[in-house]
Design a protein with these regions (language model features):
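Beta-lactam-recognizing serine transpeptidase/beta-lactamase-like catalytic domain environment
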Residues: 11, 43-136, 141-253
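Mobile, glycine-rich extracellular loop/lid and propeptide segments
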Residues: 19, 38, 48-50
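Conserved, well-ordered alpha-helix/loop/beta-strand core segments that scaffold catalytic motifs
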Residues: 1-35, 43
């Protein structure tokens, strides 16, 4: 017999403890539909801490008390009743294969959930299973694209009036930055500068480096449920639309 492979976690318990407390503090004071915190080692991608809203006990994954962070007790009771009803219908349908019985199983509406649907929602790791626009965190990639491709020298200056007319759309910035250097455009998160940089790079280069940086590709994290993002990344023809290129340059669409 051979020993199995060693399993070593990269989680830093001190970091994990801190982010779980910070997440709880935020949800208690402000709250959101879902709150996520992820801490990575930027040198090698190791996960040092990962926490999401709606914790549950892995030793008791189907403890109904955990669902109270998502639903009221009355909602849970309704789902349990609906689950029993659905199970009874399915048991009947397994004995009766007529067309009428098949149609009876199609009456589930979007707002009806079984208790198992609720648990699946609770167990879902939204950090790896959900997608979000990167927003301003994409701006360094826009600048890096320009520097790597030679579209930028690093000595550029821009003028931000608080918005930029692109086609028939006036696309805004959070502030009127006035004259701004490339370095400050990143530091102050200037949308106007990023749009101008995107235009300077052009659709083909912008798309090329989006792929080089790994957007739309699987991370290969050793956790189940990572979402497929290939269809969320535009191709060069999409970026031929000036508004699309402009907004994607600062991480939105």
């Amino acid at each position: 017999p051979k020993n199995g492979n060693s399993v070593v976690s990269t989680i830093d318990m001190q970091i994990q403890k801190i982010i779980e407390q910070k997440l709880k503090d935020f949800d208690d004071k402000i709250g959101s539909k879902v709150t996520n915190i992820l801490v990575m080692n930027p040198q090698n991608g190791e996960i040092l801490g990962m926490a999401s809203s709606y914790p549950y006990n892995l030793n008791k994954p189907m403890d109904e008390k955990s669902l109270l962070s998502l639903y009221s007790q009355s909602e849970i009771d309704k789902m349990k009743a609906y689950t029993k009803q659905k199970q009874a219908e399915e048991a009947t349908d397994s004995e009766d294969t007529s067309e009428d019985s098949k149609d009876s199983t199609k009456k589930k509406t979007d707002d009806q959930k079984t208790i198992y649907d609720a648990f699946n929602e609770l167990w879902r790791n939204s950090i790896i299973s959900d997608t979000n626009e990167p927003g301003s965190t994409y701006k360094p990639f826009t600048v890096a694209t320009g520097l790597e491709s030679g579209a930028l020298t690093g000595n550029e200056n821009y003028f931000c009036t608080g918005s930029l007319m692109v086609g028939k759309r006036n696309i805004g910035c959070s502030h009127v930055h006035g004259n701004i250097t490339l370095k400050d455009a990143v530091a102050k998160s200037c949308n106007v500068a990023m749009m101008n940089i995107g235009f300077k790079e052009g659709a083909d280069t912008f798309y090329k480096y989006q792929n080089i940086f790994g957007f739309g590709r699987s991370t290969g994290i050793d956790l189940p449920g990572e979402t497929d993002t290939k269809s969320l990344v535009y191709n060069a023809s999409n970026y031929s639309n000036s508004v699309t290129l402009a907004t994607n340059a600062f991480g939105q669409n």
